[in-house]
Amino acid sequence: MQLTELIETTVTGLGYELVDLERTGRGMVCVYIDQPAGITIDDCEKVTRQLQHVLTVENIDYERLEVSSPGLDRPLKKLADFTRFAGSEAVITLKKPLDGRKTYRGILHAPNGETIGLEFERKKGEAAMLDFTLADIDKARLIPHVDFRSRKQ
């Protein structure tokens, strides 16, 4: 079984989503997990323990295993990610330029079939819609919005 498939099966079996997986040349395996309610340190510990066991049983060589949440600026990789985060602000970098640019920032629209929409500002106050597919994307990330103001009024 391939490493990605092995880790995804383990992570989803525990009730989490595998967001991303990175393997460095120095033997480090980084696993990014998520779930609708968010990820806690306990979730990371639970997945780490299970993956350590599975990787040992499957005789997968690694130096260090790191499990964490994808962060507020999580990557968007699957069509389901774009469905889940429709209405959120994101930055999309295309593989090939469209109308002279590759990077767009705007509000995600739910996919229609394989086509994903991003509403962006073309010029001051002029809204436009970018339609693209997963195959067109080089990188896509959410843009986090953090409010540091006190909730006290």
From Swiss-Prot:
GO terms for cellular component: cytosol. The keyword Cytoplasm applies. GO terms for biological process: ribosomal small subunit assembly; translation. The keyword Cytoplasm applies. Pfam families: DUF150_C (PF17384), RimP_N (PF02576). InterPro entries: Ribosome_maturation_RimP, RimP_C, RimP_C_sf, RimP_N, RimP_N_sf. It comes from the Bacteria. Keywords: Cytoplasm, Ribosome biogenesis. Belongs to the RimP family. Required for maturation of 30S ribosomal subunits. This is Ribosome maturation factor RimP. It comes from Burkholderia mallei (strain ATCC 23344).
